Amino acid sequence: ASTSEVYGDPLVHPQPETYWGNVNPIGPRGCYDEAKRFAEAMTMAYHREHKVETRIVRIFNTYGPRMRINDGRVVPAFVSQALTNKPITIFGKGTQTRSFCYVSDLVDGLVRLGKSDERFPVNLGNPVELKISEFAERIQRLMGTNSPISYKPLPSDDPKQRQPDISKAARVQIGRAHV
């Protein structure tokens, strides 16, 4: 499995699979982003050289049960902070966007991709984009918390927008998010 991180801080929005990305190879996020890009390149090379069936899925922000609280992802961080009445921490101004996909929708897409004939990368995720500040407010409302929102500096290389173009997934009948 690959990731939307292969797009880096994208200059194209939403991100189609044909977009090569905007990754800073020596930036703080570079190791992860480039490792996923390298894995895609090796997968395609192996497919071409050895005629092995392969699939590449670029997974966008996924959430669901059993997420680790301290893994650095925004969903468990916000929920944990809201449950403990700690400030909900937003990095930057909260204008950066993400598209959140429930894990059951992702699994459905993975199964469909596995059964398809598609050999090139496919984006899997929810095409509905949400500002991080709006997401924090939604968590406050759903959790019924008094947790204030706190703002901290945006880490360098943090993507400003993240939204999958899922037209290819729809075209090859892999599906889209329902939850």
What is the role of each PLM region?
Residues 1-2, 57, 78:
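Hydrophobic structural elements of the Rossmann-like NAD(P)H-binding subdomain
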Residues 3-8, 61-67, 95, 129:
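Active-site proximal helix/loop that lines the substrate pocket
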Residues 5-56, 68-71:
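Catalytic helix-loop patch of NAD(P)-dependent Rossmann-fold dehydrogenases
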Residues 16, 61, 76, 80-176:
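C-terminal substrate-binding subdomain of Rossmann-fold SDR/epimerase-dehydratase oxidoreductases
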Residues 67-68, 159:
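Acidic pyrophosphate-coordinating catalytic loop
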